[in-house]
């Protein structure tokens, strides 16, 4: 009913206006959920810096991507759209319900738990492959670890700066600069954003 299974039974008496489909030889399942997808996206890596927690996948969803139509035909109904794996700390995710012909905004599942993409290992070390790209940091697993630690430490410093400002007189002090990168990392620390880690 309205696109949702309403009853499963051997002896169902459908209402008069129901459309009957002969299911003999067919497989019926609930909608498939893809927990790691790049559907409806292009250029999913922001490679300009190692930490890009301020970028948001929901800002670049392409509702005209033919993959949406094809995946719906295959039974996929929901996808967790993730940033690429070129950064130790990548961008913010978006969970969508695949709706062919809909807008990007209408596909976003607003009450989904907020997430962010992290990555370890070879993708991060060599996101720009080849000998000509040996200048990008990090180049080792030690560097990946250091970048992640630095990101969280910077976010905590940012929080402390704002805490001091909030406790101050405020009349004689300029407020700290807003930092979207640190704010996303603080959401992780506060349990408001979960990490999806490619490793």
Residues of each region from the PLM?
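Short Asp/Glu-rich motifs
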Residues: 18, 40, 90-92
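Histidine-rich, glycine-flanked metal-binding segment
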Residues: 1-29
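Solvent-exposed, flexible loop/coil residues
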Residues: 12, 16, 32, 55, ...
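A short, polar/charged loop/turn motif at coil->beta-strand junctions and beta-hairpin connectors
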Residues: 14-15, 49, 189-191
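Polyanionic/metal-chelating signatures
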Residues: 72-199
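Short clusters of hydrophobic/aromatic residues that line enzyme substrate/ligand-binding pockets
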Residues: 8, 55, 96
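Solvent-exposed, charged interface segments at domain starts and junctions
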Residues: 6-10, 27-36, 136-143, 153-156
């Amino acid at each position: 009913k309205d696109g949702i299974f309403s009853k499963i039974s051997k002896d169902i008496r459908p209402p008069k206006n129901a459309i009957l489909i002969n299911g003999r030889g067919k497989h019926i399942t609930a909608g498939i959920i893809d927990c790691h997808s790049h559907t409806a996206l292009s250029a999913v890596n922001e490679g300009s810096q190692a930490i890009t927690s301020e970028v948001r996948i929901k800002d670049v969803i392409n509702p005209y991507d033919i993959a949406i139509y094809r995946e719906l035909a295959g039974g996929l109904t929901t996808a967790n759209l993730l940033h690429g794996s070129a950064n130790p700390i990548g961008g913010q995710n978006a969970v969508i319900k695949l709706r062919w012909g809909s807008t990007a905004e209408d596909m976003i599942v607003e009450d989904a738990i907020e997430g962010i993409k992290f990555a370890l290992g070879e993708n991060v070390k060599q996101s720009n492959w080849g000998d000509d790209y040996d200048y990008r940091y990090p180049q080792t697993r030690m560097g990946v670890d250091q970048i992640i630690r630095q990101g969280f430490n910077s976010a905590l410093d940012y929080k402390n700066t704002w805490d001091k400002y909030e406790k101050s007189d405020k009349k004689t002090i300029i407020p700290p600069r807003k930092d979207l990168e640190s704010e996303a990392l603080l959401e992780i620390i506060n349990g408001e954003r979960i990490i999806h880690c490619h490793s």
